[in-house]
């Protein structure tokens, strides 16, 4: 905690018997991160007591300094005085409210002013160690002058008529805001003080919590890239990636000739140089033809690509593959109709003379037959008997 700035003043003490005057002339709102913040009440101390002076001050000098305290700190100091000095009659503390408004802050400042006036009038309370601790006199001497404290002190001196040390309080605050806080390097004791705990209070100034200070992280600035003027050409890293295709010429392999096709993205594969026409690696049909087979020109290919069918049935059937017709089963063969055996014809009845002549003819033929005729007769008459009769 930084010690208050102690300045010599020419104002007259109102409490000469105690040598101490305590007032609360104003308050200040301190904004924190996000929606947090608290109110500090500035206590003006005017005294000639040696406990508040440094070695450079004379015994008869009257000094003044400013101390900023929060509601919770003033409440703690009030409870200490009430518990130790029960005989002292002090005004009651202002009531606690959930939401603190401007009227509540003004009411608290007025009550704190009355309480500290009563403390400064009482000789026992004015020299109590609780008051010395509350006003921060454990570390004697002033270790620096803050712009806020000095401006308030000089503003109070201007009311007493001291023109040499008086200046405008609000003008000094504006100058400090424009100049900004000075940058100090943490060395030695400053490095140890940065490790101390700082107090974080709620917006009402009631609850207190301690948290360690965080070291500010030094951001490493990236090296800015050189700015290009209007005459400099920016190098495109992908310039050669999408350039026109290039291929080797059969006449001179060392020369690169740009391809005719502007849509080609990649170079032709390198096959080890151009191949002569009569090389044995080529197919015989290719050697005889003497050149590549003619292909469709670019315009014919475009016409074929953008051709639109006029027949609606053909357009609908473009994506569908023709289904093969199912093969018809062969009809079973029709069986032939069975041959109806014919009735043997009845020979006409012959007379007795004809019958006798007819009987004599076969007998003569039988007698005239030899062995071969008999065998042939048996074969002719035996074959139909062995064949199975067909139902169809």
From Swiss-Prot:
Stored InterPro entries: HS1BP3, HS1BP3_PX, PX_dom, PX_dom_sf
Domain of life: Eukaryota
Residues recorded with modification N6-acetyllysine: 337
Positions where N-acetylmethionine occurs in the chain: 1
Bias (Pro residues) ranges: 325-335
Phosphoserine, modified sites: 3, 139, 194, 249
GO cellular component: endoplasmic reticulum; mitochondrion
Gene Ontology terms: biological process: regulation of apoptotic process
Residue span(s) of domain PX: 19-142
Record bears the keyword Phosphoprotein: yes
Phosphoprotein recorded as keyword: yes
Endpoints of the signal sequence: none
SUPFAM superfamilies: PX domain
Subunit note: Binds HCLS1. Interacts with the SH3 domain of HCLS1 in vitro.
Record function comment: May be a modulator of IL-2 signaling.
Protein name (database record): HCLS1-binding protein 3
